[in-house]
């Protein structure tokens, strides 16, 4: 349909609306939002400003734009033609003003100068070129009033002048100027899609009312209302901050390996070939090898270990006191074939190898002779001869030994290994027991497999076989399984206090722990136990202001890398303890757990306002900044309710928090003021409309009285002046 037909259609009012204002206030965006239904994001609007003008030819060349120009306002069919202008082309604007029905005067709420120019330049210019056209004042870019200005300024072009918070104009500033000029005032946001219809519908009303005064015979213009009031815009409720848990520390394998090289708090001495002494830790060896686990649980108070047949076994303190017997048959195969035998890492029972011999090619004959010659025996003090119990060990005993780092004598467990075990391959085995890894470039793989056979570490044998078969990639799954199983054993040792070497004295009791595990997973613990402090040489450490539930949660995290909650766990006390121990990852996990609990309580209609107030300042003081941000968000979005229930607590908040509340509270203060003004103005408008209706005459006259009878026509001819006494 040709656009000229709108001018010829009966009862269709064509409205020419000219949009003027300073550069970059949002005129063209506003026109496109109405004419083309264009939607833009805030970042698109913040792109480099290029002066543009929306061509009036769009109504002729684009059918969609023409269709969207048609509207019905107060039962009047209209066709709205929008005219865009440049903000700085003075000569071109006078042609746009010609025969305009209404003028929309725009300014930006983030640019006070644009509002100042409304009074000093734009309104006088409008009245000069089209003195009878009504004017509508529009505040654009409303979304900047509640936006994050720091993010907005970062997204703008580099040389753009930053938007300052004190430059954001409140609604009353625009309303004051509009009242001074005697024109309606509206606000819009293309980003929020707010106020666009209000502006142009009321601009149409203003144009139709102005036209009604000149074309008073058009009856369809009688019911056109004056420009309506605009309800204030309620900004969207800000979403709660998301608790981000950073990646856990990546030194889970490096620290144990370093602990093996630098044996801090070592409690085991492994003697190889009567001359090589290697310091190690019970907790690492026992949680990685079932053989070491049974060895360290052995009762050393009895000097004799069974009879020559090996029927008398060790007496561990747990359920392993009756080990299952495993017998290996002799096969004359190549060493690599031996490595490919089925193996399982989860072998927890000891193996009776008495009277047996290892596979040919992997075990030296001299070592076999030594083992067969040593049946059972006695050691002075607390110790045992282990020849008939395991082919890997010769004896175990407790003795005073010099610490390799502090050079102080203390009680240690000395384990003499079989003479066939060489130091180099044995260190590779120890590295596996500490880290679960075996290097592909390790030498003496056959000796490593031999030691793994003696210690019954069958997964290590499988890793060696994979390397020999060029299938080392399969060792990753074995390493994962190693860590899973050791984690379970470490948790068991923590629960039972097995192999513990330190006791924490807490407010409500004591809890046993293991220094090597603490040192390898916490720098704070490493400094305490490895530095020149009293705690490094004592078995009891006092932890004031700490409960057993919090310390147990910290120990489980340090041992396993996982956070485990319990019913009696106090979230804030755990955050305080984790912050004291310099564990930011645990702090983040506890923050996430706390926020999840608060949100679940909110969904169950439980009042959490009091808890949030308590959490806020504690979280800020103890570096739980994500929890503090969440608490700030909750208080800001429930500000009125919190103030009503806890007025004293809110007044006792720090000045920084109170300033934050005033700046970020929702609904914001300007909205509450606007809502109050809108309600008062609406009541006044209703009262004015009521009084206006009462003043209207009950009887309306037409321009002439149609004669219904001869007498009436005679009366009409007798008094001709009665025909001109009508009221419209």
UniProtKB/Swiss-Prot annotation:
GO terms under biological process = small GTPase-mediated signal transduction
Query: Does Ubl conjugation appear among the keywords?
Result: yes
- The record lists GTP as bound by 21-28, 84-88, 140-143
PTM comment: Autoubiquitinated by RHOBTB2-CUL3-RBX1 ubiquitin ligase complex.
The UniProt subunit note reads as follows: Interacts with HSP90AA1 and HSP90AB1. Forms a complex with CUL3 and RBX1. Interacts (via BTB 1 domain) with CUL3. Interacts with MSI2.
Supply the PANTHER family for this chain: RHO FAMILY GTPASE (PTHR24072)
Protein name in the entry? Rho-related BTB domain-containing protein 2
Protein source organism: Mus musculus
